[in-house]
Amino acid sequence: MENAKLFFEEFIGEKSLDFYSLAQSGSARKNFVGSTPNQQYIITENENIPENESFFYFSEIFSGLNLNTPKIFKISEDRKIYIQEFLGKHTLSEIIEKEGLNERTKSLVRQTLEKLFQLQTSTEGKIDYSKTFEYESYDEFPVTNDLFYFKSFIADVLEIPYHKATLLKEFKHLTSEIENCAPKGLMIRDFQARNIMVNDNDEVFFIDYQSAMKGPLMYDVISFLYQAKANFPEDFREEMLSCYFSLWKDENTVKELKNSAKPIQLIRFMQVLGA
């Protein structure tokens, strides 16, 4: 914490009014809130430089396109600490958990899908996928990796007997289906309500995209609407899917999106079970 605080105070040119850590959530990244009399900031400390570089790369592109993502104000020389925009006190996940599915949360979910559509379409042709963190695209390698998490769950946790060759053939078939899903573009990968901030004006912001890669555009839509913790009712999911499809004006694109929904839904369920 001390290094992050010193870096922040060097940036603001004075002692911080307040400086405290945020709870970690399944990541090695450490986040802090630093305050001046007029403004709050997020200070992030992370030893994983390739992960940081991916975040910096995407943030620069997103800021240039005026998307709903944090601006980065300063990066340390060793690329391990950075100061970013403070975008709200609560995640969308916290709001859903507290309020349930009311008119406010429905509006926030709809806004999230609209902002996702904006990100997907405005970044088309503007991403160098060689700069991604772990995988350039959601192809055979990450798909197979996800499926083998599920295999370990079946074999090691539930101890359900299965025919190995048959299961592997099914994996191969599903991998091929996922690889052929269209349209493709920027896929955030971990597009969950816990990674979406909501400010005092009920505007949503995406904050966790360092693992983004090229992939089927329906992946993030399905990840978001079918996340277990939100527990959206099926009729609301269908309503929001229709809302998302209506944003696309090309009928062939909508047809492709609809055709890719079921295979992606299946692999997302398998990922959740495997994790």
Which sequence ranges carry the predicted segments?
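Juxta-kinase regulatory segment immediately upstream of eukaryotic protein kinase catalytic domains
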Residues: 1-20
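Protein kinase-like catalytic core scaffold
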Residues: 41-42, 68, 82, 185, ...
